[in-house]
């Protein structure tokens, strides 16, 4: 998936660094409850990364409230450069025990971990957001500035098994690798 494309673009192996991983339940706050610090919504978001609200995750992935999920936040690196940050929600009851084990114990990229259980494809982009690099906000050499944010649904057949939000960083565009058009 994204890792293979990045390796081709960068002309170098891409490594994954899992920054946060937690198995839990998709908890959807009731309408009358407000979500503050320590609320159940915090459990439905990957650490330090803006993700979709839990009710939107449930809608896109066809999940019931309380569904077993894994929340993941990773950095993808080409050499020492961080080129992408990604957050994901994976429906644990829709993947094999072997896939759950790989996701819980290794830094294997999400696409590769899920591909072992049968074809996974990106069937829908929930959103794609180009990002302007504002010089007043970002210093000229800020390689960590986002340039594109993509939110995609991962499916096996017609069944959603994951939702991933990838933030492509300026460092990806600043790489010296030669790219074919």
Identify the meaning behind each predicted range:
Residues 1-181:
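Composition-driven recognition of glycine/serine/threonine/acidic- and proline-rich low-complexity segments
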């Amino acid at each position: 998936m994204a890792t293979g494309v990045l390796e081709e673009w960068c002309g170098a192996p891409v490594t994954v660094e899992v920054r946060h991983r937690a198995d839990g339940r998709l908890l959807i706050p009731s309408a009358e409850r407000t979500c503050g610090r320590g609320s159940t919504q915090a459990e439905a978001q990957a650490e330090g990364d803006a993700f979709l609200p839990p009710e939107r995750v449930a809608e896109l992935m066809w999940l019931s409230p309380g569904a077993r999920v894994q929340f993941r936040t990773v950095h993808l690196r080409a050499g020492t450069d961080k080129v992408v940050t990604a957050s994901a929600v994976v429906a644990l009851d829709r993947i094999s025990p072997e896939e759950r084990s790989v996701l819980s114990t290794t830094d294997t990229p999400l696409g590769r971990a899920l591909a072992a259980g049968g074809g996974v494809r990106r069937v829908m982009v929930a959103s794609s957001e180009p990002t302007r690099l504002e010089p007043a906000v970002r210093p000229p050499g800020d390689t960590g500035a986002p340039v594109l944010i993509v939110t995609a649904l991962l499916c096996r057949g017609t069944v959603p098994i994951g939702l991933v939000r990838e933030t492509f960083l300026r460092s990806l565009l600043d790489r010296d690798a030669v790219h074919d058009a």
